[in-house]
Amino acid sequence: MTLFILTETSAGYALLKAKDKKLLKRDDLATEASTAEGVSNLVKLKSFQKFDSAATALEEVASLVEGKVTPRLASLLDEIKDEKKVSLAVADPKLGNAIGKLPGMSIQLVADSTTTDIFRAIREHLPTLIPGLLPQDMSTMSLGLSHSLARHKLKFSPDKIDTMIVQAIGLLDDLDKELNTYAMRVKEWYGWHFPELAKILNDNIAYAKLVLKMGMRSNWETADLAEILPEELEGTVKAAADRSMGTEISQEDLENIQALAEQVVGFAEYRQQLAGYLTARMNAIAPNLTALVGELVGARLIAHAGSLTNLSKSPASTIQILGAEKALFRALKTKHDTPKYGLIYHASLIGQATGKNKGKMARVLAAKASLGLRVDALAEWDDDATEEDKAALGTEARYNLERKLAAMEGKPLKPRGVAIGPNGASVQPKKFEINETRRYNADADALTGDQPASKKDKKLIEEVSDEEMADADSDEEPKANGTKDDDSSDESEEESSKKHKSKKGKDTELEKMAEKAGLSVKRYKRKLERGEITFDANGNPSATSKKELKKAKKEAKKASKGDEKKRKRSDDGEEADNGEKKKKKKKKGEE
């Protein structure tokens, strides 16, 4: 069986033919192939397919790495396609499987450890096997192709560098810790000299700037603090400095305190700059995620997942509890309820929800964030696309979530036509102007209280004339003729109006009670029929869940069982006492 060897080089594809059919089974293959002459005696060049350019070489090698057969390689293999009893040695088993799947290719493929020695020898002495190929050119082409292949694998893009976000959010958290530590140290240190200042100023940055500006508290008269503090606080600080109870410090102590205060101010300025940089990078890399959860929460999610691509591959359920892994595994181990949210808890939408709705909002927000992440990671935008176009999905989803949250909380909904800004917040409306209302015209009133009402003198005794009682038939005749008495019609109208008013009153009462219970009118009626509404001492309703009702029923059953046991015990005790009394009576009778 004829043996062919396929070699992939940076210059092109080389197809070599072995002079010995049993070349791979020889024991002295490594020793004979150690020199260029030995390799040339073992194999000879059958065909060579050269790459036209560096770009072509990159495409071909990238396809080979993925285990794909390119048209150029397939055309080279067509030369040995018609030969019978042929075996082909390939260095990569994945490539060998792909070649074996080619239509009409009946070749025995060899891609195991027996080919390592011959491939090593061919790579070392390749210029001697291919005429016109110099060793210097070979090394240059290999170096250039390796650089291009590495760049191709990295898929370098300055707009998709999520490593910068990971480092920036980590540095931001470290700065917050250090800034807090240094600021507290400044307060404790300078507090020996001016202890009243810490109670007046709560802002750490303003405190450090004031220490740098004023120095000794005795300089309060000449120090201009208008740039740091408002007028009211400035007067309070100066008055406190005038009658301070602090100790005196030396100039050397003040210099060290001011050096630390300079560090605090410098860290604060750099933190503000870093926060702006992080916001810009998040809007460029993940605009939809930023519109939904904010730049800080989005950056922490990306940092926790490792990269934007890894986070986009995660399902919504994973994004929802990302950051709460310890609580999740603890709950699974102890068979308790799993956590509802992780890092996503700090998003503004979840912060706006009440306790009972936080879990629902976390689930819905994680689902929308997973969709936005896939768009951010995998979408390819044109150069003409604006930031609003890129963040359109996240902005629209945030607006829908805000409406859903308002519906759950019972708050008024925003109108559908409201304008939404790039940050997801609604644009403020124009200034509301109050028009002058129409005044009440008092001249149009008619005064009727000047004339007293006429009173008719009623007789103490009146004569009533006797009237004959009409028959039942005569009473029914006018009714049958389609006429009714005026009195009966008035009474029926009054009754219908009373019923209508009572229905309205009941509906308004139901609406009020439903609002107090935090439910809709339908749910309030349903729960009231089921007995799931309880009233406190003031008459305010509150809804109870099915779990609470079950617990209450179980407790009532336990209490009833306990009472029955106590009754049985008391009955047994009474029977025992009665038996003892009877025995005593019998003994007395016998005596």
Curated annotation (Swiss-Prot):
Residues 285-410 form the Nop domain. InterPro entries: Nop56/Nop58 (IPR045056), NOP58/56_N (IPR012974), Nop_C (IPR042239), Nop_dom (IPR002687), Nop_dom_sf (IPR036070), NOSIC (IPR012976). SMART domains: NOSIC. Its main location: nucleus. One of its GO terms (biological process) is endonucleolytic cleavage in ITS1 to separate SSU-rRNA from 5.8S rRNA and LSU-rRNA from tricistronic rRNA transcript (SSU-rRNA, 5.8S rRNA, LSU-rRNA). The keyword rRNA-binding does not apply. Residues 430-442, 453-462, 477-486, 505-515, 557-571 have a biased composition (Basic and acidic residues). Residues 581-591 have a biased composition (Basic residues). It is found in: Nucleus, Nucleolus. The keyword Nucleus applies. Belongs to the NOP5/NOP56 family. PANTHER family: NUCLEOLAR PROTEIN 5 NUCLEOLAR PROTEIN NOP5 NOP58, NUCLEOLAR PROTEIN 58. Required for pre-18S rRNA processing. May bind microtubules. This is Nucleolar protein 58. It comes from Neosartorya fischeri (strain ATCC 1020 / DSM 3700 / CBS 544.65 / FGSC A1164 / JCM 1740 / NRRL 181 / WB 181) (Aspergillus fischerianus). The gene is nop58.
